[in-house]
Amino acid sequence: MQIQLLAVGTKMPTWVTEGFNEYKKRFPADCKLVLHEIAAQKRTRKADLNRVMQQEGKSLLQAIPKGNRIVTLEVKGQAWDTPKLAQQLEKWQMDGRDVTLLIGGPEGLSDECLAAAEQRWSLSKLTLPHPVVRLIVAESLYRAWSLNNNHPYHRE
């Protein structure tokens, strides 16, 4: 199975890239974590932010491989603790499909992205910076994988 983190925004700070890559390399070949970045639309003072969000949403949806399970990351999604995320990861693996996790831009995800989602995941009720979300997702998924595989990384 492959877990694709599909995120709006490029040119992340070095610490974000290094942190994500550290977790990415820990995953085994049968549960790969990959990052695919979509360029953010330009935001000016007079920009129609709804239109910007729609354009970013269209780009996100076009980048999803056919047949993938789509999971959006959003404040209004379902909160999963580590054991629940581990259960979700196990279900995804048993399903046999690859998974795409969507992270929107500063305004969030378009209605089309939300409608395409099979699941909605909330990391927190807090508003989190998008670079930090990438790290939290990568670490949380690795922790869930380690729990499912009796790896000593996760401790209760």
From Swiss-Prot:
PANTHER family per the UniProt record, alphabetical: METHYLTRANSFERASE (PTHR33603), RIBOSOMAL RNA LARGE SUBUNIT METHYLTRANSFERASE H (PTHR33603:SF1)
Function according to Swiss-Prot or TrEMBL: Specifically methylates the pseudouridine at position 1915 (m3Psi1915) in 23S rRNA.
Main localization, broad class: cytoplasm
GO molecular function terms attached to this record: rRNA (pseudouridine-N3-)-methyltransferase activity
Organism the protein comes from: Idiomarina loihiensis (strain ATCC BAA-735 / DSM 15497 / L2-TR)
Reaction(s) this enzyme catalyzes, per UniProt: pseudouridine(1915) in 23S rRNA + S-adenosyl-L-methionine = N(3)-methylpseudouridine(1915) in 23S rRNA + S-adenosyl-L-homocysteine + H(+)
Gene, per the UniProt record: rlmH
Pfam name, any one: SPOUT_MTase
Compartments in which it is found: Cytoplasm
Signal peptide: none
Keyword line: Cytoplasm, Methyltransferase, rRNA processing, S-adenosyl-L-methionine, Transferase
E.C. designation(s): 2.1.1.177
Amino-acid positions noted as binding S-adenosyl-L-methionine in the UniProt annotation, renumbered to this chain: L73, G104, L123, S124, K125, L126, T127, L128
InterPro entries for this protein: Alpha/beta_knot_MTases, RlmH-like, tRNA_m1G_MTases_N
Similarity comment: Belongs to the RNA methyltransferase RlmH family.
Descriptive protein name: Ribosomal RNA large subunit methyltransferase H
